[in-house]
């Protein structure tokens, strides 16, 4: 990976620019603030865009390493969320019975 001969960035540079632009939009700001209670952090997208452009222009090893680490961190962050509900292997035994509110009527 250090030689960079056949390596390509994980995403096209346009993708990093689009993500950065979306992150800075008013709509995303309002949504993120409503959901998380804090401002969205867009600096990483900007750093990734700069690294991608640096890679395209100079084939910089530092830019390559930065992009790889950033994408790995994104994958780890996406995988760390656990399921809220445990998946069922089979339906409950009484699934066909009427619901309690239907019994009262």
Curated annotation (Swiss-Prot):
The keyword Secreted applies. InterPro entries: Pants/Emi1-like. GO terms for biological process: negative regulation of long-term synaptic potentiation; regulation of synaptic plasticity. It is found in: Synapse; Synaptic cleft. Rapidly degraded by proteolysis following neuronal stimulation, resulting in increased AMPA receptor clustering. The keyword Secreted applies. One of its GO terms (cellular component) is synaptic cleft. Keywords: Secreted, Synapse. Belongs to the UPF0545 family. Negatively regulates long-term potentiation and modulates adult synaptic plasticity. Stabilizes the interaction of RTN4 isoform A/Nogo-A with its receptors, inhibiting clustering of postsynaptic AMPA receptors at synaptic sites. Upon neuronal stimulation, degraded at synapses, reducing RTN4 signaling and allowing AMPA receptor clustering at individual synapses. Interacts with RTN4 isoform A/Nogo-A; the interaction results in enhanced RTN4-mediated inhibition of AMPA receptor clustering. Also interacts with NCAM1, RANBP2 and CCT8. This is Synaptic plasticity regulator PANTS.
């Amino acid at each position: 990976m250090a030689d960079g001969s056949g390596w390509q960035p994980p995403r096209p540079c346009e993708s990093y620019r689009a993500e950065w632009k979306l992150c800075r939009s008013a709509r995303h700001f309002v949504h993120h603030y409503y959901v998380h209670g804090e401002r969205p952090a867009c600096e990483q997208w900007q750093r990734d865009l700069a690294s991608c452009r640096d890679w395209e222009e100079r084939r910089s090893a530092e830019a390559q390493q930065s992009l790889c680490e950033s994408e790995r961190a994104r994958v780890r962050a996406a995988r760390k969320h656990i399921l809220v509900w445990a998946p069922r292997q089979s339906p409950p035994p009484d699934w066909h019975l009427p619901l309690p509110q239907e019994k009262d009527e």
